[in-house]
Structures are given as C-alpha cells and as structure tokens.
C-alpha cells in the first residue's frame, strides 16, 4: 500500500510539473499570438513574415535589480535624426552560459509625461544574434516599475520584440547604447523580419 501511494504521489508530482511547463509555454504562445494579431505596423498577410524563436525557459531570468539614484538625463541615439531623452533607471544582472550579464534599464523622459506610461521602463539590447538571426539595430524588452519586486525583476527574453524601424522607415527608434551590447546569444523572442529592408 505504501509503495502504491509513493508511485501515485510521484506520478502526481510529475504531471504537475509537466502541466506547469505546459502552462508557461501556453501563456507565452498566447502572448506571441496577441502580439502578432495586434501589431501596430505589420498588417494583413505580412504578419506571416513575423518570426520567433521556439519558446525556451532557459531565457527567463529572475534578475537582481539595482536602482541607480539621481541618474542624469542624456540624449539617446535613434535610428533617425531625432535623439530622445532617457536616463539609466537601474541595472539588471543575470548569468547565461556561465557568463555574468549586466544590462541597463532605461526610462524615457517623454513617456513620463504620459499618465498611462509614466512607469514604463525598457531594456534595449544587442546580442550575438544581432544582424544574423535578429534585427541589426537590436531588440527591446519592456515592463513597468511595479514589476520590480524586492529588487528582483523577471526578464523573459521570449517576449523580446523588434522596434517598428525593423519593418518600415519613418520612425525614430532608440538604438541600444554600447553598455547594452552583449556578447552572449539571446536565442529567444522575435527574430529578423523577413521583409525588412534594413
């Protein structure tokens, strides 16, 4: 009887772990589906050209977050002629393939004036896939100040996406500063747009 109970308990734990993983992948797939369906630039049949890496939990990190106090505003380079005012709000730290990675978190001065976006933060980054498998001017991951809990930020690169400049001209998209150009490969999130002219 004890042996049967142990077997049933093991099966239950295994099925629970499987369902949790399945639930994670399902939620990410829902995120990607919604991203494609509601895309602000790519329309109609062109949406078939949006590509993504297979969902991989390896690229989901509980990062240590360090707030940078009294960080000065600076003009961040963009893909166009207009520079945009940002500041380093903080830094995140995580380890990938035995490499400690540091990325700066930025806050837009313009978006702080918009009530719905005043807590918006983002991480623009380039990595070892940039220009090969992913857009040559980098990708973004964004979130809210409220997502930072006890100096921990969940960064899921499966949600990394391309700026609008990857699809069409006419936008001034922030270009990742040199501090956010890393040598490891983030093989997660959105890939290079097939119809990109850049």
Residue ranges and their predicted role:
Residues 1-23:
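Bacterial Sec-dependent N-terminal signal peptides
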Residues 122-162:
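Acidic, glycine-rich flexible loop segments
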Residues 21-29, 161-198:
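Extended, aromatic/histidine-rich regions of cofactor-dependent oxidoreductases associated
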Residues 78-137:
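Mid-length scaffold segments of soluble, non-membrane domains
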Residues 20-73, 83:
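Start-of-domain marker
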Residues 46, 57-59, 71-78, 90-92, ...:
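Terminal leader/tail segments of proteins
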Residues 62-64, 95-97, 104-106, 126, ...:
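A structural detector for beta-sheet-dominated domains
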Residues 67, 109, 129, 161-163, ...:
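Short loop/turn segments at secondary-structure transitions that flank enzyme active sites
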């Amino acid at each position: 009887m004890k042996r049967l109970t142990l077997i049933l308990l093991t099966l239950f734990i295994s099925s629970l772990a499987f369902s949790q993983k399945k639930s994670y992948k399902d939620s990410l797939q829902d995120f990607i589906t919604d991203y494609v369906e509601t895309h602000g630039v790519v329309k109609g049949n062109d949406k078939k050209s949006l590509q993504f890496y297979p969902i991989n939990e390896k690229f989901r990190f509980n990062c240590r977050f360090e707030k940078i106090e009294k960080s000065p505003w600076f003009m961040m380079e963009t893909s166009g002629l207009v520079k945009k005012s940002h500041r380093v709000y903080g830094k995140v730290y995580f380890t990938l393939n035995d490499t400690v990675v540091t990325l700066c978190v930025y806050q837009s001065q313009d978006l702080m004036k918009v009530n719905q976006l005043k807590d918006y933060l983002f991480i623009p980054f380039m990595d070892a896939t940039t220009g090969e498998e992913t857009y040559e001017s980098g990708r973004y991951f964004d979130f809210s100040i409220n997502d930072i809990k006890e100096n921990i930020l969940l960064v899921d690169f499966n949600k990394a996406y391309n700026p609008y400049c990857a699809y069409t001209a006419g936008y001034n998209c922030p270009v990742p500063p040199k501090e956010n150009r890393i040598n490891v490969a983030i093989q997660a999130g959105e890939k290079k747009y097939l119809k990109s002219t850049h």
